[in-house]
Amino acid sequence: MTPKYSALPRAVLFDMDGTLVDSTEMWFRAPDELVRQLGYEPKPSLYESTFPLGTMEIARFIHDDYHTRQSVEEVLSCLDARLYRYYAQEATLKPGGEALVRRLKATGVKLALTTATMERYARPALQCTGVDDLFDLVLTTDRAGCTKRDPEFFKTALRLLDVQPHEAWLFEDAAYSICTARALGLHTCGVADPGAEFDQPAVREAADCFLESLADWRKLPFADKL
């Protein structure tokens, strides 16, 4: 392990859904609840079909697959209302999440939320979970204008935080995002999530280290600095 690898980072970037916020169950339930709300019976394959999709894509899929009377825009409006209610009123952090971000902040580490979830949901989620005052930056893919497959997303985050890639860590549950960040020179920590078990082998292989839970933060290479 190199000294830089075990050094206290100047910045830590957190993915939101499945990494910092315990939202997997909500994303499992939301499409099912939406289909029932629209007056249809959910198919067993609904979650598998919608898991990798964004909100507009979910709305379009449900409209097309269930031939809904409601337009795509009306389906999206119903989905948006459900998601906003969750993030603004029901969201919780994953075990160990609050302790980790508070320790990082207490040592002077800059914190960023880097997420593919819309900013309309991300900021209320931080407020709902009581950690909004700890984050120096919220960068969403809709705000950045690119996905986390695009290196420009992480370049933007680093520029706004005023840190170099080797000075930053990314905590993430998606292998594709970890690969993008590592290619830029960021250190990466994979985080287990029940909703992304299919991706876990790739996450373990791609990341510098892996945590079964954020509560295991003492296993981090720089834990002795916290």
Predicted regions and their residues:
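Asp-based, Mg2+/Mn2+-dependent phosphohydrolase catalytic module
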Residues: 1-10, 102-105, 118-226
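Conserved phosphate-coupling serine/threonine residues in phosphotransfer and NTP-handling enzymes
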Residues: 19, 115-117
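N-terminal helical cap/lid subdomain that shapes the substrate entry/recognition surface
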Residues: 5-107
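Electropositive, surface-exposed helix/loop patches at the edges of structured domains
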Residues: 82-86, 110, 161, 224-226
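Residue-level marker of regulatory loop/turn positions in helix-turn-helix DNA-binding domains and
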Residues: 93, 114, 146
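Hydrophobic beta-strand core positions in alpha/beta domains
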Residues: 112-113, 190
